[in-house]
Design a protein with these regions (language model features):
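Terminal transmembrane helical anchor/hairpin motif
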Residues: 34-49, 168, 176-249
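A residue-level signal for alpha-helical anchor/packing sites in multi-pass solute transporters
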Residues: 73, 82-85, 120, 156, ...
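Secretory targeting signals
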Residues: 23-66, 70, 97-164, 171, ...
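Aromatic- and glycine-rich beta-strand/loop motifs that create alpha-glucan
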Residues: 1-24
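Helix-loop-helix units of permease transmembrane domains in multi-pass membrane transporters
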Residues: 71-105
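Helix-capping/transition residues at the boundaries of transmembrane alpha-helices
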Residues: 10, 75, 87, 158-159
Length: 249
């Protein structure tokens, strides 16, 4: 717990709040522009339309955002060359766990606030039908779980490389692959970690080529995909932790 508190104390001047505010602003702007182009017929499916497009926005924005947060958490020790000093006070495993816990809490707060903002957007735009509270809660949980899988990967890279450009390049590539993977067959998406934002979406889309009508419908993530997400997370966590423990300081 002391190490976790130390992480928050250390990051108080790392502009984490500004980074999170920028993420929310970009998502709000993106979705605002999207909804401004929809007609009344489209808005009848407003809640499903919102969650469907949020999955796409997550696939584009969150990989780089997660990489940025992980980098901000780890770069100070690299710049100050303080790893050896820290490891005299705590084991590498505990240091790794503290940073992972910090990332989990920051992402949880960020995504809960994001869900609250978009619930407010739905109310302001007067979406038809009752508010899908359960779906929003599950969507937030899924976004957090996928983001934590990506965070485990990014933290491993940020801890291993002193130059944070390597980790950020991975984040940029993840954003590109995240949205590109939504065009892949589902079997192929499962091999793209960043593709799980779209793979585990709660809303599907059906476009009728004859009538040219788009229909959205509720769907549930497959249990096999949930299991694969947990496997990816475990791999990134265990490998990242092992490399950090063996890293020479």
């Amino acid at each position: 717990m002391k190490l976790l508190k130390l992480e928050f104390f250390k990051c108080r001047r790392r502009k984490i709040v500004l980074v999170c505010a920028a993420i929310l602003a970009v998502e709000l702007l993106w979705m605002g522009v999207f909804f401004a182009r929809q007609d009344a017929e489209d808005m009848k499916q407003g809640w499903m339309l919102l969650l469907y497009n949020l999955s796409m926005v997550d696939a584009i924005i969150l990989p780089l955002s997660v990489a940025t947060l992980a980098s901000r958490s780890c770069e100070l020790e690299h710049k100050g060359n303080t790893w050896k000093l820290l490891e005299t006070m705590a084991s590498p495993v505990r240091l790794y766990a503290a940073k992972l816990g910090w990332g989990a809490l920051v992402l949880a707060v960020l995504l809960v606030i994001r869900s609250g903002l978009f619930l407010a957007v739905g109310l302001v735009l007067n979406f038809s039908g009752p508010i899908p509270w359960g779906r929003f809660a599950l969507f937030t949980l899924i976004s957090w779980a996928v983001s934590m899988m990506v965070y485990a990967l990014q933290q491993g890279l940020s801890l291993w490389f002193a130059n944070q450009a390597a980790a950020l390049v991975c984040g940029i590539s993840g954003s590109f692959l995240g949205i590109l993977s939504m065009l892949f067959p589902p079997a192929l998406i499962r091999f793209v970690p960043w593709g799980y934002y779209g793979l585990m979406a709660l809303v599907g889309m059906d476009w009728n080529e004859t009538t040219r009508v788009t229909r959205f419908y509720w769907c549930w993530p497959r249990l096999s995909d949930v299991a694969l997400l947990l496997i990816w997370s475990a791999i990134f966590l265990l490998v990242g932790r092992a490399l950090f423990v063996k890293k020479e300081v």
